[in-house]
Amino acid sequence: MAKSVPAIFLDRDGTINVDHGYVHEIDNFEFIDGVIDAMRELKKMGFALVVVTNQSGIARGKFTEAQFETLTEWMDWSLADRDVDLDGIYYCPHHPQGSVEEFRQVCDCRKPHPGMLLSARDYLHIDMAASYMVGDKLEDMQAAVAANVGTKVLVRTGKPITPEAENAADWVLNSLADLPQAIKKQQKPAQ
């Protein structure tokens, strides 16, 4: 059996990139300051990097799945060009009130459900207890709880933080950029 690895599960909009609302074009995709360096450092620390993103804009007819895939490929290559190799990219195109019939459904992949995280766990042999979920919304924290992710990290770079989201999180950080240092500080043995 393959050895399990710890992972950093990453929401996309508001965590990796600025959330301009239904981001689906390269021209509107803006990496948040410091996140690329942080992702590179997290890889060096031995974490798998896994993007788990709700993309209801597909179901809502705001953009097509092909447009999302083109942007995702560009993001993946942009990160790879900066020595950040993602281990997985999982997305949910569904929404129960979607206008595109093919994607209008209740599913187990849309956060707060844990489907994307569990799929990644099974495929990549992830040690969930040693992993982190980083996101900007309550649904990210709820998905992490449902998937038994060890540490839930809420970031201030996306949607305004709600009291419910803050209560569900283990840590609240200003940005994903702060995560490597926070993990190192936590892992430091007591003197």
Curated annotation (Swiss-Prot):
> Which terms does the record give in the GO molecular function aspect?
D-glycero-beta-D-manno-heptose 1,7-bisphosphate 7-phosphatase activity; magnesium ion binding; zinc ion binding
EC no.?
Answer: 3.1.3.82
Q: Where does substrate bind?
A: 11-13, 19-22, 53-56, 110-111, 137
The pathway this protein participates in, as annotated, is:
Nucleotide-sugar biosynthesis; ADP-L-glycero-beta-D-manno-heptose biosynthesis; ADP-L-glycero-beta-D-manno-heptose from D-glycero-beta-D-manno-heptose 7-phosphate: step 2/4; Bacterial outer membrane biogenesis; LPS core biosynthesis
Instruction: Tell me how the cofactor is bound.
Output: Magnesium. Can also use other divalent metal cations as manganese and cobalt.
Q: Which residues bind Zn(2+)?
A: 92, 94, 107, 109
Q: Which organism is it from?
A: Escherichia coli (strain K12)
Q: What is the lineage of its organism?
A: Bacteria, Pseudomonadati, Pseudomonadota, Gammaproteobacteria, Enterobacterales
Instruction: Say what happens when this gene is deleted.
Output: Cells lacking this gene result in the formation of an altered LPS core, but does not appear to disrupt full-length LPS production to an extent that the outer membrane permeability barrier is compromised.
Please provide the record's keywords in A-Z order.
Carbohydrate metabolism, Cytoplasm, Hydrolase, Lipopolysaccharide biosynthesis, Magnesium, Metal-binding, Zinc
Identify which cofactors the protein needs according to its UniProt entry. Mg(2+); Mn(2+); Co(2+); Zn(2+)
Q: What is this protein called?
A: D-glycero-beta-D-manno-heptose-1,7-bisphosphate 7-phosphatase
Anything further noted? Phosphatase activity is essential for nucleotide activation (fourth step). Zinc ion does not directly participate in catalysis, but probably functions to stabilize the loop conformation.
What pH-dependence text does the entry carry?
A: Optimum pH is between 6 and 7.5.
Q: How does it assemble?
A: Monomer.
What's the domain of life for this entry? Bacteria
| Reactions performed catalytically | D-glycero-beta-D-manno-heptose 1,7-bisphosphate + H2O = D-glycero-beta-D-manno-heptose 1-phosphate + phosphate
This protein's GO cellular component annotations are:
cytosol
Family, per entry: Belongs to the GmhB family.
NCBIfam families with a match to the protein in the record = GmhB_yaeD, HAD-SF-IIIA, Histidinol-ppas, PRK08942.1
